[in-house]
From Swiss-Prot:
One of its GO terms (biological process) is translation. GO terms for molecular function: rRNA binding; structural constituent of ribosome; tRNA binding. This is Large ribosomal subunit protein uL1. The keyword rRNA-binding applies. The lineage of its organism: Bacteria, Pseudomonadati, Spirochaetota, Spirochaetia, Spirochaetales. The gene is rplA. Keywords: Repressor, Ribonucleoprotein, Ribosomal protein, RNA-binding, rRNA-binding, Translation regulation, tRNA-binding.
Amino acid sequence: MSKKGKKYIEAFSKVDKSKFYSIEDAISLLKEIKFVKFDETIDISVNLNLKKNHTVRDTIVLPNQFMKPKRILVFAKGDRADEARAFGATYVGDDDLINKIKSGWDEFDIVVATPDMMKDVGRLGPILGKRGLMPNPKTQTVTNNLKDAINSLKKGRTEFRANKNGVISFSFGKSSMDNEKIKENYEEFIKEVVKKRPSDLKGTFIDSIYISSTMGPSIRVEFVWR
């Protein structure tokens, strides 16, 4: 058995799988059982009770940011392009950027487009769609309000969505952060998820919540806002 494997098993043994931990206790336990030297990301997995026709998808700006600044690419022309540059977009262009991306360039993290550009940007569907970067009005990345879009993205606005199995996976902190700040991010995220409850859903919406660190075991968190 590898040294890493032994440490994981030791950490795993400290988690009571039959217990529902408070978020405060769960965060403390994650830090207690940490066995790697790097600054781990803290993730959440929310299992939802959804029907096949239900979609849960939105964006959120957490109160306490922890991720590296993202490179924002904006497809726009004329005055809109000038606005995007003024508001701090990393890359701004139209056909030039479309052709560059077609050639294999991928040094960007978020894509925003003005509505008039979407017909042309649509040609990049197979490329951007594969990376989950296709601009979409639902994620506020197709807009003429570039100031608000870019500012919120620079503040860390991030998309979350439930997969086909009704599970939302999302990163909401780093192990180096203060426990209270991790908790604040958790509470803000759960609040936003609860808002997305389908209007026709009967019964429980959130089935279970687990948090984990990059290398650590998952910990089940109690949920009291059903």
